[in-house]
Swiss-Prot record:
It is a single-pass type II membrane protein. Residues 1-9 are cytoplasmic. This is Signal peptidase complex catalytic subunit SEC11. The keyword Transmembrane applies.
Length: 169
């Protein structure tokens, strides 16, 4: 075992991980979204977006218009929701924009999904971003890995095996 070679591999791995992290943080700053890329997890927005589509978000617009597709998070729930703005108005006391959303494939609006006692989303507090682009079906890989525990272990095993194979000279 060559210590210098092992340290070089370790540093290369650290470089790749830190570069990936910095890219994600830079993208987050550029788009003003803590999660600038999300995967559609349900069919509530069909036919516009299918389960497994990857969405690219932008949160630098001052307001959202009726018809915009937004991603929002509700306090106490960890999964972001992708739905279309159905109505919008402004709070008279604060001047903040309030939004009512609905999934294209749903029968009713999203009020039952909002935090208890809220009938609208607050644009600045609840909305993660507005959808500006997408790649169809590419997100199925992440859905498959997250829903299949064997896939997680298999992927980790493949990574470990590849590092063992590549370390043998």
């Amino acid at each position: 075992m060559n210590l210098r070679l092992e340290l070089t591999r370790f540093l290369s791995l650290g470089y790749v991980l830190s570069s990936s992290f910095m890219f994600w943080m830079g993208l987050s700053l550029f788009t003003d979204c803590h999660s600038p890329i999300v995967v559609v997890l349900s069919g509530s927005m069909e036919p516009a977006f299918q389960r497994g589509d990857i969405l690219f978000l932008w949160n630098r617009n001052e307001k959202n218009n009726v018809g915009d597709v937004v991603v929002y998070e509700v306090a106490g729930k960890s999964i972001p929701i992708v739905h279309r703005v159905l109505k919008q108005h402004y709070d008279r006391s604060t001047g903040e924009q309030l939004l009512l959303t609905k999934g294209d494939n749903n029968n009713g609006d999203d009020v039952p999904l909002y935090a208890r006692g809220n009938y609208y989303l607050n644009k600045t507090k609840d909305v993660v971003g507005t959808v500006k682009g997408y790649i169809p079906q590419l997100g199925y890989v992440t859905i498959w890995i997250s829903e299949n525990k064997y896939a997680k272990f298999g992927l980790l095993g493949l990574l470990a095996l590849s590092s063992l194979i590549s370390s043998e000279d």
